[in-house]
Amino acid sequence: NSEKIIELGKRDNIGFDQMIFFDEDRVTSNKASITIFNSDGKEVDACGNGSRCVAKILCDKTKKEYAVIETSNRILKAQKISENNIRLAMGEPIFDWKKIPLSENIDHKKINLNIDGIELKEGFALNVGNPHIVFFVEDCFKYDLKKIGPLIENHKLFPEKINVTFAEKKNANNISVNVWERGAGLTKACGTAACATGVVAFEKKLTGTGTNIHFKEGFLNIEYDVNISMTGPVSDIKEIAIKL
């Protein structure tokens, strides 16, 4: 139940942004259906990094180089590039305001918000399996996301709430990001935020079809040409048993 997930997600417990369920014992091929919960106990449609982790488990278990993962709204195809690197095909981004979703029909590429007296210009909203808004700024770490992140996440324009990314272009191939994750809070990494940022950078003609998205810890390579693909490392931390 959600209370148990919230308890386990606390940093003085297991500590996680997402908990993902799939029946490993029933995996006889390299395919699996997954259910994803944020650390606030709510079920969500997508988790890019979590899906790559599941893909590595499937590839290791089945001794195959490919895996197929079914989420609540997408079929994701993964490839094991090396022992600890997984590429995940995320499908096409969604730009339709009703499907992002937004609460009103406005230009999703140029969303201006006044948040706690701070003017935020030309936010780009899209859906990459879950809803995101990306603001390109001069210094992505100048903003206090612990303060303004939840205000943007819960803004009336976003009926299903939204993930928030402040992005800073370093050069033609590298972007730094600071991310407030819907239902999880300030995060050190978010796969779908990396995907959203890569798409927005391309659409704004800031980068080409491929770019590296840098978080506080590590980076992901995003390629976008109609479809999105995300490549990055996966590492085992610890195997534990818990009672649910």
Task: State each model region's role.
Residues 94-96:
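Ligand-binding beta-strand-loop-alpha-helix segment within the catalytic cores
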Residues 102-112, 150, 154-159:
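Short, conserved active-site entrance elements at the starts or edges of catalytic domains
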Residues 72-74, 91, 116-120, 216:
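Short strand-coil-strand connectors
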Residues 85, 92:
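Glycine-rich, mobile lid/loop segments that gate access to catalytic sites or pores
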Residues 88, 124, 190:
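Beta-strand scaffold of nucleotide-dependent catalytic cores
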Residues 1-84, 133-244:
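A glycine-rich beta-to-alpha transition motif near the start of alpha/beta enzyme domains, typified by
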Residues 109-141:
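Internal active-site segments that recognize and position negatively charged phosphoryl groups
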